[in-house]
């Protein structure tokens, strides 16, 4: 059986300037604060709460290992914790622009994630019973991620 993907929702969040901790043995540690945002899709709509971040490592080969954690709040007040692991890579020229916060064409960047969702709301339990993937786009002050459920 060939797996299929079902679109679930699109998330748009604003991010602050990265905190660059500098080189560590695994690469360059950067912490990108999440300032807030919105999400909307099939039966889900709400906001991205401020206070999350992406604790990323940029390896020597330019690949970014992403470890993003944040909280969503639905329009009816339900909370969803998100832990989103992923990778992002591009050519050295495009990666250099990304690191400087310059705009790049999203089609030149491979940006994929595998999120895990947690919620105590019974009507959102399905989020914890499926596998999801995300496709991302990075802009100077924003990130857009589209989440898909693996059927």
What are these regions (language model features)?
Residues 1-151:
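Beta-strand-enriched cores of mature, soluble protein domains
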């Amino acid at each position: 059986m060939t797996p299929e993907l079902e679109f679930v929702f699109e998330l748009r969040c604003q991010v602050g300037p990265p905190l660059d901790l500098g080189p560590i043995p695994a690469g360059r540690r950067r912490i990108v604060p999440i300032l807030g945002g919105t999400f909307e899709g099939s039966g889900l709509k709400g906001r991205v709460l401020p206070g999350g971040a992406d604790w990323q490592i940029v390896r020597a080969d330019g690949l970014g290992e992403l470890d993003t954690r944040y909280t969503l709040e639905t329009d009816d007040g339900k909370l969803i914790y998100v832990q989103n692991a992923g990778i992002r890579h591009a050519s050295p020229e495009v990666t250099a622009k990304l690191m400087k916060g310059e705009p790049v064409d999203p089609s030149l960047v491979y940006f994929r994630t595998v999120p895990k969702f947690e919620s105590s709301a019974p009507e959102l339990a399905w989020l914890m019973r499926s596998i999801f993937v995300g496709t991302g786009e990075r802009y100077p002050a924003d990130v857009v991620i589209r989440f898909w459920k693996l059927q």
